[in-house]
Amino acid sequence: MVEKIIAIIEQLSKKYSVKPIIPDTASFSFILESPHIQELKHSAPVAGSSGKTMASVLLDQTVEKPLGLLVKENAEAGFPDRTLNRIGIMNVSNIPLQKKAYDLLDVKQNEFFFDLLEKIRTTNERTVYSIPEMNDLQTALLQKFNEHLMQIRGRTCTLVPCGRFAQKFVRLSTVTDDNWNIMYDVPHPSYNSWNQTRYRDKISELKRTFFENIIV
């Protein structure tokens, strides 16, 4: 079943995939759940409202563009910005986990697969499921995610999994490195959460670590 799920993911990836953007000089990499509509449009992780929240908080200024678009445009321009050069962005899954991002025909052709995606996306507290197919889907997603982490293995860097889904998969991953500093418990930046009072201490810690490692 794992092989069948991977085949579906690879087929959907031909039309709906958003790849990581990790400059060779990246020393601070953010890990999110998956792309959505704006990410597909711009072919960059965190290219929507969540990305705007990230950019405004991290750069300590109001910005018009989301972090994903800033990092992508900097890469396309030949890496002129020394700060953006050191930021990597990736998703656990290169394809969206929400079926709203897909054409209706593709959803109808893979209804069972999309039902599993929705269930695994909303049950972040679990690592083992009573439904065998959900365990198979988790294994398939983890295999793909491990490929992303292999790209930065051997680097000295800080990894920031944002939100419970990303944190769960970082913990499940067998790809590790003693040179990595992993900052857990950072919320997903959706719904302007990084500016909410209840996350103030964690976001202050994130900004402090970011400035110590990135701003040049």
List the predicted regions and their residue ranges:
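A polyanion-binding, active-site-adjacent surface
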Residues: 1-157, 165-168, 191-194
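Short, glycine/charged-enriched secondary-structure capping and boundary segments
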Residues: 43-46, 103-105, 173-177, 199-201
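Solvent-exposed amphipathic alpha-helical surface segments
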Residues: 61-65, 173, 213
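Short, conserved loop/helix-junction motifs that constitute active-site signature segments
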Residues: 150-155, 173-179
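Intrinsically disordered, charged low-complexity linkers and terminal tails
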Residues: 154, 208, 212-216
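Short, flexible loop segments at boundaries between secondary-structure elements
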Residues: 175-211
